């Protein structure tokens, strides 16, 4: 009997069962009651001090943080005078993600509902110039000036009223809960998914919510022996800083006795390199529409990084992962570098041979443009099922590969349409000044290329487009466990005070936005966000448990999710 294969089958079965038991609507089935009970909102006496330490700005609290946004909108909903502004806010967001065919009708309805003085929901706080532009305008971004005006209005008096409300106190309760330590015991490990230079990646489940994650475990001794502290901290800080549906998110960072752990978005569909070569070995590569869809999502992920002064430096098919629905995210930011304030370029050899731009190979200073060269290589490989500088399966020394990148003109097989060939050529320009890429703070120059003529960028970025391929939910897109291999024990490494301090700094706990999203999507937020119908202070704020409350209190509560 092949016990290695048996181990893989058993591990895969357990993991697939866990995947099947969880979705956003039926989370309770996969929750651990013991740990769920520990997710309990504290009395106000425990969290009032947070007023002094939290950033209480309108944008950060009410627009960026999911629970903050929900509570602010719930507050507005309970105050009739703020109803028109709230509804206009939501309707503009709905318009921005609507199908093109529906937008004219929605625009007309929006103008009639909020911009006409006789309308029931007339927004009298809007100035005449903003209203006139919204009435006369057309096309993308039509109502963005209007949305900015609405949010500017809500960020003044309504926001100050929110800060004096029970809804803000509820926000403090959630921030207290968010800050509580959640370490190794909160997570159940399933099978190993892969192995890197410093440790392994496991599929895991957050016990209290049932949500599945990937846990990257960096062995402490191996990190110290191979001088990996700086790289690990850079990756962790960058992951914590970025939040995009096109980049894996960091939800938790903690330490165990042996490892530093990064709990991140799990991508069950495997990497696109696997799909290029292994799914249909007789016909490797993607049809162009599929390659274009993935490229568009990668462009949005790169733009998010570059707007935050982060150069990725390791874009390649292995680092682009598919989720359950078939959308892709950029992963593995271990080689990324963040430019300092005022810095426009950096130096340093980093990346994968065949994907590194000429200026990087020559040891010159470089900027975000190196990532768009790598994007060109990645798109080429998606379509051609080979790299632009070597044939499939060809063994090429790095020195020879470097010369090809610097000097060789790229040839294109017949699989490339004129648009995809032109786009690749624009990305694979040897001269970074001529290369298509990030300009003036955005990737609009790429978005307007004919390659993306069928892509609705608004809907893509809202996650509303249907992917061209959906991974099989019954398949684990990972190597067999015995093929992943195992690390040998690291000997002769002792930790000192400086090591312990580094580990403690690394283990920063929960990341606010992903954690709040988890609470909402798994139903925990709705379960705990209980209010009295008479508008008085809920029992949990007073520190009164459900058992201590009056017998009739259960029927006298309402839940707002």
UniProtKB/Swiss-Prot annotation:
Membrane topology label: Lipid-anchor
Record organism: Bos taurus
Cross-referenced SUPFAM superfamilies: Protein kinase-like (PK-like), Regulator of G-protein signaling, RGS
Record-linked CDD domains: RGS_GRK1, STKc_GRK1
Pro-peptide region(s): 559-561
Modified residues (Phosphothreonine): 8, 489
Functional summary from the UniProt entry: Retina-specific kinase involved in the signal turnoff via phosphorylation of rhodopsin (RHO), the G protein- coupled receptor that initiates the phototransduction cascade. This rapid desensitization is essential for scotopic vision and permits rapid adaptation to changes in illumination. May play a role in the maintenance of the outer nuclear layer in the retina.
Tissues expressing this chain: Rod outer segments of retina photoreceptor cells (at protein level). Retina.
Similarity comment: family membership: Belongs to the protein kinase superfamily. AGC Ser/Thr protein kinase family. GPRK subfamily.
Assembly, per entry: Interacts (via N-terminus) with RCVRN (via C-terminus); the interaction is Ca(2+)-dependent. Interacts (when prenylated) with PDE6D; this promotes release from membranes. May form a complex composed of RHO, GRK1 and RCVRN in a Ca(2+)-dependent manner; RCVRN prevents the interaction between GRK1 and RHO.
Main location: membrane
Activity regulation statement: Inhibited by RCVRN, which prevents the interaction between GRK1 and RHO. Inhibition is calcium-dependent.
Gene (name only): GRK1
Protein name per its UniProtKB record: Rhodopsin kinase GRK1
PTM field: Autophosphorylated, Ser-21 is a minor site of autophosphorylation compared to Ser-488 and Thr-489. Phosphorylation at Ser-21 is regulated by light and activated by cAMP.
